Amino acid sequence: MTHPARTARGPDLRLVRAWIDRYWLAVWFGIISAMRLSVLSTGEAGFDARLYLKATRAWLAGADPWILIDTQRFAAPPPTLLPLAPIAILPESIGVAVMIALAVVGAVATVRILRLPWWWILFPPFLDAAWNGNPQNLLLPLILVGAGPLAAFLKIYAVLPMALTLRWRALLVTGAALLVTAPFLPWGSYIAQFGDLSTALATQSDGGLSATALPWLIPVAFAALLFAGRERAAWLAVPALWPTTQWYYSTLAVPALTPLAAAVIAIPVPGAAVVAVVIVAVTRRTTSRDRLVADWRPGILGRP
């Protein structure tokens, strides 16, 4: 008895397609992070931590905190100095290690709080901040767990997502804390040197990555943020519009990103954050005026 010949089957590509659908963004993050590490690893980890802590030690000693390391100048607003003081009194090597560890913890906490896939830890701006020991990675988890005032002292622009997400209590506490601590912080020196410090920031960031690096993108960014809705614009506004942004500023955008927007904002080129906001806005498909108004209408009580 003869059996009919079986038709030869090609490889089943469904599993391959499913794997690509699930992990393409992880691979993209991994490639960019590996490229960034290949550059960063030629130097010493923790540069930002050293700069921040040296500036804080200078302030604690009664000197001007706007110091230089190599060609990089500390130019953050005075409130940044206060939460770093307990770390600055540690031996330098330990202080730098603590700053790097906190940056790693901040990235992990963000992934856990937002319930993102584990591979989001590879998001290149997380890596950039962690390698440099920059406190940027702490902002998002601090805001999300109700410690927004501490985030605002670390980086003053944290007040923008706090305001747009209606965290009134956090804003009131922040304002009160800024008033109470103002006499102890070097605001006079900062204001007197504001022009020079702003120029230093612009030089050190090569003009930044936000729309301010390409001014014709500014109206595009505003329009895209409008159509993205208030909740998403809250997290996207700093990467898209804040002057002289650096790559790790994009960590604030994570709660609002779609996969495609995340892939774009992971690229360290001027205007990428604006393109990401446009993608989020298009995905929202907010075309009616009523829906747009509803997206921006404040809640009654806001958030803590």
Predicted regions, residues:
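Primarily membrane-embedded glycan-assembly and transfer machineries that use lipid-linked glycans
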Residues: 2-145, 167-304
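Transmembrane helices and adjacent periplasmic/lumenal helix-loop junctions
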Residues: 148-166, 244-249
